[in-house]
A protein has these predicted regions:
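Major-groove DNA-recognition helix of helix-turn-helix-type DNA-binding domains
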Residues: 19, 46-74
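Positively charged, aromatic-accented nucleic-acid-binding surfaces
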Residues: 1-44, 69-141
Length: 141
């Protein structure tokens, strides 16, 4: 995880679970999402999630401070690289979330599982679709 603060070249408020989330594009073209906004949208504790992200061996690489506009002016905020959001979202504990957010997180997690499965089957040259479409287990070799 890098600790230098990036300057955005473009920002845009996007909607996530019917809540505004600030997205920022930085100089190298990467897009970061404000972690505090993501947590608010998913009814998650920001401090706990930031601790989790920073402690995770893989996800910490996607955490970066970006100087973002706030009501008090530009301030450095922790953001998560867009590519890391699906893995983070699929790893959160949904126990304390409202029923609506639990269902949304479940939907996203199942979508992530399907997309990763498709990527694996394509990389391995296996039939697409469900695993029952693989007629010969030797195709897995």
């Amino acid at each position: 995880m890098q600790e230098n603060v990036l300057e955005p070249i473009e920002t845009l408020v996007v909607t996530f679970f019917e809540h505004p989330v600030l997205a920022a594009r930085v100089k190298d073209g990467s897009i970061y999402m404000a972690i505090s906004d993501l947590c608010e949208a998913a009814e998650l504790n920001y401090r706990a999630q930031l601790r989790r992200l920073r402690a995770d061996q893989d996800l910490k690489d996607g955490v970066q401070q970006v100087r973002l506009p706030t009501p008090g002016g530009l301030q450095a905020q922790y953001c998560l690289l867009l590519e890391y959001v699906p893995t983070w979202i699929s790893s959160v504990d949904r126990a304390r979330a409202s029923d609506l957010v639990k269902e949304r997180l479940r939907y996203l997690r199942r979508h992530i599982i399907r997309e990763v499965y498709v990527s694996i089957t394509q990389a391995a040259g296996l039939p697409t679709g469900q695993s029952r479409n693989i007629e010969d287990l030797r195709d897995l070799e």
